[in-house]
Amino acid sequence: MLQEILSSALLMLIMIDPSDKILLVSLLREDFHIEDVKSLIIRANIIGFLLLLIFAVAGKIILQDIFHIELDALRVAGGFVLFKIGLEALESGGMVTIKKEKNILALAAVPVATPLIAGPAAITAAITLTAEYGIVVSVTATFIAIVITAVLMLLSLYLMRGINKTALSVTIRIIGLFIMAIGAQMMISGAGGIVLSILKEA
């Protein structure tokens, strides 16, 4: 079970993708007090975990029984969103800027907790991990990934200050390319599952 938890936590961490959250923190650090940014990070990750917990426990019921959405369709949608985010990072060397708020904590739930932390890719992963390994592995892996994400975001408050903006832009573009590849793979996997499902019914 330990190996399943660790591999699942790695998958969830990739789906959450702390890299763009770290960039967000560096941008917010320039305009807001560091203590406010810390509070934002903690609140956003708690909210993000609770959202993923809901989908890990009851996501299949919510999606398939209520909305009649198949997991493969969600994989395609999540992959498309990831591909789009990666493409934006690759082209611009940055992420879409968030409209400034007078109260930074207003950003904790939306857009930081969702869709940045608990986005389509992470939600898909939570549901898929529950289906494949069970609720204990899925929730534990999600918790580990969220803790790592929160720690990286908090550390970036201090580490990102000395990084050259040009180097940061290049790094973001490279990360964007990998995000695009992950998104493309998710879309291919989801589309393949949809095709197989259609062939079985035919």
From Swiss-Prot:
TM region positions: 5-25, 47-67, 76-96, 104-124, 135-155, 174-194
Membrane topology value: Multi-pass membrane protein
InterPro entries per the UniProt record, alphabetical: Multi_antbiot-R_MarC
Subcellular location field: Cell membrane
The keyword Glycosyltransferase is annotated on this UniProt entry: no
Matching Pfam families: MarC
Main location: membrane
Keywords assigned: Cell membrane, Membrane, Transmembrane, Transmembrane helix
GO cellular component: plasma membrane
Family designation: Belongs to the UPF0056 (MarC) family.
UniProt protein name: UPF0056 membrane protein PYRAB02000
Organism lineage: Archaea, Methanobacteriati, Methanobacteriota, Thermococci, Thermococcales
